[in-house]
């Protein structure tokens, strides 16, 4: 993966000045997307914003989170001509301000998701980026001597028309299987009293919940995976536009 991209994401999040060093433009000029367009196509948010990964970059003394990963994926996509929004609002602050607790996080993310959806009708894909709670072995795959964080798609089945979300998610997972079969743990459907069962996916057919790695995954492994997920998203949006 591109270390420069990862470092730029991390420095942006902690408020440091971004390096003036030129990062090579890796965008694909043959894409069907209009790279001059300012209309966003992808919205990335983190319902559980503080979920952490392991920092194996000693240069930076910080704990990377799923929010770090969201910003990295944004950079990957924008270098492919896909304008992307990452939700910057503080989920914990929303919970505190509204006397809610961590279990109510989907109420908070729903508020910002609805705002983004209403304010940006051009959006084609909504990604709630999480990480799982897994051992490093269970969350990791090595392919061609590169270590990747495995992914899992989650679909809630406790609302009407969830099948549309399931079909959409399975179509993305199929692209992963066709191109990077080693990466995916599949699509998990959740329902019942002990789970959320909706995950705000009732707001759009094009909302996916993506688990990238686990609590023992390194941010480098996550970045390696997101490089490939960026390609998957390019292919999916290309199908939609085609």
Q: Language-model segments: what does each one mean?
A:
Residues 49-52, 90-94, 131-136, 158-161, ...:
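Solvent-exposed loop/turn segments at secondary-structure junctions
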Residues 186-242:
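Active-site-adjacent mobile loop/cap segments within catalytic or ligand-binding domains
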Residues 135-164:
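A short, glycine/acidic-enriched catalytic loop
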Residues 41-46, 125-130, 152-154, 207-211:
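Soluble periplasmic/extracytoplasmic beta-strand elements of cell-envelope proteins
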Residues 57-140:
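Catalytic-core regions of hydrolytic enzymes
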Residues 53-64, 73, 95-104, 154-163, ...:
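Second-shell loop/turn segments in exported
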């Amino acid at each position: 993966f591109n270390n420069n991209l990862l470092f730029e994401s991390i420095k942006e999040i902690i408020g440091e000045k971004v390096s003036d060093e030129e990062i090579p433009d890796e965008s694909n000029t043959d894409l069907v997307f209009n790279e001059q367009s300012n209309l966003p196509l992808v919205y990335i948010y983190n319902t559980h914003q503080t979920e952490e990964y392991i920092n194996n970059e000693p240069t930076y003394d910080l704990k990377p989170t799923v929010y770090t990963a969201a910003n990295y994926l944004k950079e990957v996509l924008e270098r492919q001509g896909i304008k992307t929004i990452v939700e910057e609002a503080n989920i914990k602050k929303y919970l505190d301000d509204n006397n809610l607790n961590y279990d109510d996080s989907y109420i908070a993310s729903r508020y910002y998701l609805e705002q983004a959806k209403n304010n940006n009708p051009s959006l084609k894909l909504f990604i709630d980026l999480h990480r799982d709670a897994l051992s490093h072995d269970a969350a990791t795959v090595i392919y061609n001597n590169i270590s990747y964080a495995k992914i899992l798609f989650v679909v809630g089945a406790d609302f009407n028309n969830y099948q549309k979300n399931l079909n959409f998610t399975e179509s993305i997972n199929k692209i992963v299987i066709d191109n990077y079969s080693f990466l995916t743990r599949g699509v998990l459907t959740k329902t019942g009293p002990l789970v959320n069962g909706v995950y705000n996916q009732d707001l759009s057919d094009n909302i996916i919940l993506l688990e990238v790695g686990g609590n023992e995954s390194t941010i480098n492994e996550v970045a390696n995976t997101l490089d490939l997920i960026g390609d998957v998203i390019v292919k999916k949006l290309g199908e939609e536009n085609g």
